[in-house]
Regions:
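N-terminal export signals
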Residues: 5-24
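N-terminal (or domain-start) structured segment
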Residues: 24-111, 174-203
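Conserved hydrophobic residues forming the short capping helix/wall of the S-adenosyl-L-methionine
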Residues: 49-53, 169, 213
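Hinge/capping helix and adjacent helix->loop/strand transition within the periplasmic-binding protein
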Residues: 77-88, 100-189, 237, 242, ...
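Short beta-strand segments
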Residues: 91, 154, 222-223
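Solvent-exposed coil/turn segments that connect beta secondary-structure elements
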Residues: 94-96, 120, 130, 207, ...
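C-terminal lobe and pocket-closing loops
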Residues: 208-253
């Protein structure tokens, strides 16, 4: 979902009382964003904060970023520091679920209360602008030849782009344990690594990459949707003979 569309949608929901957060009737909200600045959770959290202010559901919203371990570090801090605090909320999503399953931290989502699912989107795989590769086929050929030579960059281990890379490996006959996956603490760090050419191929939410794709700073190879996304001329993995489809979602606890 485009960021401007998301903001308008949240503002409309807030104005009509359509967000479950209206039940809090808080004047000063504290929002935990369990990722470093610049990524999808950060964008979602700050857009939500703006919508709550615009909808007069909060007088102030303060944000705290705590990245790492697919959101588990932020979750642990949120649970420990905000127990029983009705004015504390946290952004989360599918990435956190994957991280909790793979990382097995001592904290779980059972310690928090789900409020709303806010957004859904598909991922895109991209190349740095200076990459010697041109297509997904080029990347896959090198990946099959020498899996370790292809650095896949994205969010924390267990993120949807990490899972998608493993699914791609399985589809093309590569042992998923041989994937050279470089995990970052948030989408902002992953984006910087892609722009800097520090990874071979990067993945993340399309909304996070859109401006760089449009500016020619990244080359979009494939989206992880079942069919092409409306208004976006990027082929799906399925179109390119790789039967992989996986989406991402974000919500608030």
């Amino acid at each position: 979902m485009r960021r401007d569309t998301f903001l308008k949608s949240l503002a409309a929901l807030a104005a009509t009382g359509g967000l479950p957060l209206s039940a809090l009737a808080a004047t000063n909200l504290k929002m935990m964003i369990p990722a470093n600045p610049g990524g999808g959770w950060d964008t979602t959290g700050r857009a939500l904060g703006k919508a709550l202010l615009d909808g007069k559901l909060a007088d102030t919203v303060t944000f705290e970023n705590k990245g790492g371990a697919a959101g588990a570090l932020g979750l642990a801090q949120f649970v420990a520091g905000s127990k029983g605090d009705g004015n504390a909320i946290m952004v989360m999503g599918a990435v956190m679920l994957g991280g909790l399953i793979t990382g097995k931290p001592p904290v779980s989502l059972s310690s928090a209360t789900p409020l709303a699912r806010l957004t859904s989107e598909y991922n895109v795989f991209v190349l740095p602008a200076n990459s010697p590769f041109k297509t997904m086929k080029d990347v896959i050929e090198q990946f099959k030849k020498d899996p370790g030579s292809v650095k896949w960059g994205g969010g924390s281990r267990g993120s949807t782009e990490h899972i998608a890379a493993a699914m791609i490996a399985r589809q093309v006959g590569v042992d998923a344990t041989k994937i050279n996956y470089v995990a970052f603490r948030g989408g902002g760090e992953a984006t910087a690594a892609i722009l800097g050419g520090n990874v071979t191929i990067g993945g993340g939410g399309y909304s996070e990459m859109a401006e760089y794709i449009a500016a020619g700073k990244m080359k979009a190879l494939a989206v992880t949707s079942g069919a092409r996304l409306k208004g976006i001329s990027v082929p799906t993995l399925k179109e390119q003979g790789i039967d992989v489809e996986i989406g991402n979602w974000r919500g608030v606890f």
